[in-house]
Regions:
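Conserved beta-hairpin
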Residues: 49-69
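Active-site rim helix/loop that mediates acceptor-substrate recognition in acyltransferases
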Residues: 34-56
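Conserved acyl-donor/pantetheine-binding loop and adjacent beta-alpha core of acyl/acetyltransferases
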Residues: 66-125, 131, 181-182
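Conserved active-site alpha-helix within GNAT-family acetyltransferase domains
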Residues: 137, 149-151, 160-177, 183-184
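A short beta-loop-alpha structural element at the N-terminal edge
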Residues: 2-16, 20
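Conserved acetyl-CoA-binding loop-helix of GNAT-fold acetyltransferases
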Residues: 126, 132-145, 169
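Conserved GNAT acetyl-CoA-binding A-motif
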Residues: 117-119, 146-159
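C-terminal "cap" of GNAT-fold acetyltransferases
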Residues: 152, 156-161, 180-205
Length: 205
């Protein structure tokens, strides 16, 4: 997998991939049901700007697939970005829509494990034009190799049950489930214990 760390110079590319990848997602298509494309793009750009504070936003060379990780001890948004996110929600979604989005985010926060340090897979998406080639899972597998080298655990939420078995094949196990408000979809949470790097092959004399 030919992957690299994304920078702010890649923001346009990674934001487009994430926006299109999650356009039909059971959770986020419901939460962002009302804004126009520019409004949705603004949400994702702000979220990615928060993640790009860390060197853990990964992309294939042309941005066909993107993974967004928050490292141990990190936050998805700075306090200033959180305030901007709330203002954007109210202006784009209205009071009711912003309240629903806030309730959705609270569900994710409440379910998030606290205790053992871990890498958090906030987002993983493939541009619709490049789906069906395993790029997202290949990028995730490459990332996990780096996380294993640190002996660290990993956590994710699966908003699409079609992906659960794919995550399990990469070592994630069921952690829990929660329902989103207003009869929303079920979100599965998954945990992958720290493993350590693969041992080097033994060379015999």
């Amino acid at each position: 997998m030919d992957a690299r760390v994304a920078t702010l110079a890649d923001l346009d590319v990674v934001a487009e991939t994430i926006q299109l990848a999650f356009a039909d997602d059971p959770v986020w298509s419901r939460a962002f049901a009302h804004p126009d494309d520019r409004g949705v793009a603004a949400f994702w750009r702000l979220w990615l700007e928060g993640a790009l504070r860390y060197p853990w936003v990964w992309m294939t060379q042309a941005g066909e697939a993107v993974s967004v990780w928050i490292p141990p001890g990190g936050d998805e948004l700075s306090p200033e970005q959180e305030a901007a996110f709330k203002r954007l929600a109210e202006s784009s979604l209205g009071r009711r829509g912003a309240s629903y989005l806030d309730a959705v985010m609270a569900c994710f926060t409440e379910a998030h494990p606290h205790g053992e340090p871990h890498y958090y897979l906030s987002l993983l998406g493939t541009h619709p034009a490049h789906r069906g080639h395993g790029l997202g899972m290949a990028l995730l597998a490459e990332n996990l190799t780096r996380i294993d080298a640190e002996g660290a655990a990993a956590y994710l939420e699966s908003s699409n049950s079609a992906n659960d078995q794919r995550y399990q094949r990469l070592g994630f196990a069921l952690h829990g489930r929660f329902n989103l408000p207003d009869d929303g979809p079920i979100v599965t949470t998954m945990w992958r214990p720290g493993r350590g790097p693969e041992p080097s092959p033994i060379r015999r004399p």
